[in-house]
């Protein structure tokens, strides 16, 4: 069924639960009549085919699970859930050994779990895991200091807990949560060839990545936390890595490192791609999967959003806001439940980002920073009569530069 429709900001409706409001020390609330929503000028209607989108299933409250089994290996013959949980518990405690009595695991399963833990190294200090003569596990670390092991493990657990709390509000759909976590990785992990090689710990605690596998492995770990099936895939030479995620039986490519390199992760141009599209984006026509199962990605998730120079997610509202549709600039809302598109503001947005329950954008006409509330379409200046030259979201912060600042200092609007 096809629908044609176009609406103004006054008609914006979004069902939103559990979304924190942003805190802005410099933001000034203006009288209701100070800033009027710009009138919508006649323009061609947006024609969209309305359909259910993959991953529309709603999530409850997401709780960090350190021993969640990676979905890429959950059903394989080279992984043991019980063994993995037992080893994770010991490593997080900084123990030198793990009692494996009662654990039935083949050599192939032991090797599979060992390789996974060594390549991911979430808790930062693991050196190796081997079986001893009694069939238990001997664990060695990069430090002899047990307290340091425990401290680093706690730092990682705390970082992931905070990340999930901020990025995945209760009521998010699987898809909106997956997009939100993708944005976190693309916006907050920076490539640094000198970064300490401790994999997930380095990426999610320190925000540093040596290479693309750090991005892909971090995103994979976070997707497993929200129950989204996924796998890390590698280029033929093994030098580059990205993710394939599966929602409702349909698989898509996601490349957070390429996204980060384009504009600091401010768009969604590399999320939800088909096989043909990923080859265009990162240059790799063939790849292999970490679990030796190659999934076909036959179609794109939302091509219109991918083509916009700026796009951001309202995870709780299960929507994406983006800045360009069919060659026409504006502030648009893509419903992640059914694919419907709504024009929220008929303006020329210089840049766009979502923080909490507000969509922020710079109006090219007056260079002012506006915020449009997603719950009711209320439109105001975010900073009273202060021209702004640039904005970008990094995690739970909106960073902006005022137009008259010769030093281009970044100011911050943050979540409560």
Question: For each of these PLM feature ranges, what is it?
Answer:
Residues 12, 241, 318:
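Residue-level detector of short, conserved catalytic/binding motifs and their immediate flanks
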Residues 148-204:
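Secondary-structure boundary elements
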Residues 191-225, 242:
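Flexible, surface-exposed loop/gating regions in the mature catalytic domains
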Residues 20-172, 284-416:
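N-terminal accessory/pre-domain segments preceding catalytic cores
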Residues 214-277:
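Hydrophobic/aromatic-rich core segments of domains that either
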Residues 4, 13, 212-213:
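Conserved structured core elements
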Residues 15-18:
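C-terminal motif of bacterial Sec signal peptides marking the signal peptidase cleavage site
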Residues 1-9:
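Bacterial N-terminal signal peptides that target proteins for export
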